[in-house]
Amino acid sequence: MAAKDVKFGNDARVKMLRGVNVLADAVKVTLGPKGRNVVLDKSFGAPTITKDGVSVAREIELEDKFENMGAQMVKEVASKANDAAGDGTTTATVLAQSIIAEGLKAVAAGMNPMDLKRGIDKAVVAAVEELKALSVPCSDSKAIAQVGTISANSDETVGKLIAEAMDKVGKEGVITVEDGTGLEDELDVVEGMQFDRGYLSPYFINKPETGAVELESPFILLADKKISNIREMLPVLEAVAKAGKPLLIIAEDVEGEALATLVVNTMRGIVKVAAVKAPGFGDRRKAMLQDIATLTGGTVISEEIGMELEKATLEDMGQAKRVVINKDTTTIIDGVGEEAAIQGRVAQIRKQIEEATSDYDREKLQERVAKLAGGVAVIKVGAATEVEMKEKKARVDDALHATRAAVEEGVVAGGGVALIRVASKLSNLRGQNEDQNVGIKVALRAMEAPLRQIVLNCGEEPSVVANTVKAGDGNYGYNAATEEYGNMIDMGILDPTKVTRSALQYAASVAGLMITTECMVTDLPKGDAPDLRAAGMGG
């Protein structure tokens, strides 16, 4: 086992604080509308330029192992805030740095670290309740656009695009961010249900100019099995040909003789058919087939429930107004399924979302809800260079998470004002002893830190602005972009309550643990190995 280096008491805490300060100082230059960028070197390709706090934090690794431990613990604050709300990572880092610095001063002055932590925790619990009381719902498009704009570093086009996307696919809809091809940002909305499976044969294409298959008012056959024998398909094909409508087959696979016969029938114009593979794998495929059946008013032909393809009738088929299939995707538009059945299916999936344990499962279930309930919106980010594209994409992602958080828990006045109002309301909060009271004061003083940092990044004097804002009440605050005072809500400077709450809770959680640290243990750096190249040579 490798030898260890151990540091105790003040020696350990000073080293740890130095690491905290290096990471926090690198992150906090990005805070606010006039925050600066950070350039991150990459082992290959062009450097990345970012104004996203968590991206900066993730890159920092220090040489001194004790300092690095401090930095890594604050990195955890930024990551947790990012996971919970998708934004507020820089605010969380600034809060953590302030609580740790003030808390360690109090420990050095002889306060009991455990009581300090209890005081900090008490202040944070009370602050979260006050934040909830200050919160107002965020329901209209204007407020959603304002939240998106602030989170995307005052980029109004991004805020408007996100509001428009939410308008079109609903607040539960899936909104994804992709690289665009031009210089402008674009919004692309896919209505209906789209899944990532294309046609099984290019011979099905009936719109050569777009390379797509378009079927008007088709019957939709859903089969949870491989189809390779054309005999079991004949009754269905004959019934569809009599009805004079096209047919879409969605099955585990269609191959061999069956696929060849379908292609020949299509080319001769006997019956218009297209076949695609069912989306997903295993249990997820079964669930998605059932989703499509609900949407189109059909039945999944599955041998598990004793149904045979040969006995399928037109009553078992789903129907839709239109289906568009290209090389990679299939889109079903306006399925004829009953609204009550669709809502019941959506409620069932939502229940599964609540019980899901992994983020991946939750995300996939959320996508299924969106496909059934609304649609999918894609924001295509435009930029002149790849470096700018990466930076902008990160900002749009942040803005998207922030707007979702705002819809979920409401909004409070932005620019650090909400935390200052909370701190002033809690000025009479007391603990069980004097050390706890100091802990409460440490937490309340830290709540001023985000506003002070925003002002500092503007090149103004933090104390002057902080005192002016404290002298006001309600939503009165400082607009750092225009350098004016006024009502933050009226000026459109909003922060999602969830983002502010998560930042405060995670900062206090990690900072409290660091204040109560008395000993740090790490591996000793390995010394230079002796040069043995000439060992054993004769004299």
Swiss-Prot record:
GO terms for cellular component: cytoplasm. ATP binds at residues 30-33, 51, 87-91, 415, 479-481, 495. It catalyses: ATP + H2O + a folded polypeptide = ADP + phosphate + an unfolded polypeptide. Keywords: ATP-binding, Chaperone, Cytoplasm, Isomerase, Nucleotide-binding. Gene3D superfamilies: GroEL, GroEL-like equatorial domain, TCP-1-like chaperonin intermediate domain. It comes from the Bacteria. Its main location: cytoplasm. Its EC number is 5.6.1.7. It is found in: Cytoplasm. It is an enzyme of class 5 (isomerase). GO terms for molecular function: ATP binding; ATP-dependent protein folding chaperone; isomerase activity. InterPro entries: Chaperonin_Cpn60_CS, Cpn60/GroEL, Cpn60/GroEL/TCP-1, GroEL-like_apical_dom_sf, GROEL-like_equatorial_sf, TCP-1-like_intermed_sf. Pfam families: Cpn60_TCP1 (PF00118). GO terms for biological process: protein refolding. Belongs to the chaperonin (HSP60) family. Together with its co-chaperonin GroES, plays an essential role in assisting protein folding. The GroEL-GroES system forms a nano-cage that allows encapsulation of the non-native substrate proteins and provides a physical environment optimized to promote and accelerate protein folding. NCBIfam families: GroEL, PRK00013.1, PRK12849.1, PRK12850.1, PRK12851.1. Forms a cylinder of 14 subunits composed of two heptameric rings stacked back-to-back. Interacts with the co-chaperonin GroES. This is Chaperonin GroEL. The lineage of its organism: Bacteria, Pseudomonadati, Pseudomonadota, Gammaproteobacteria, Enterobacterales.
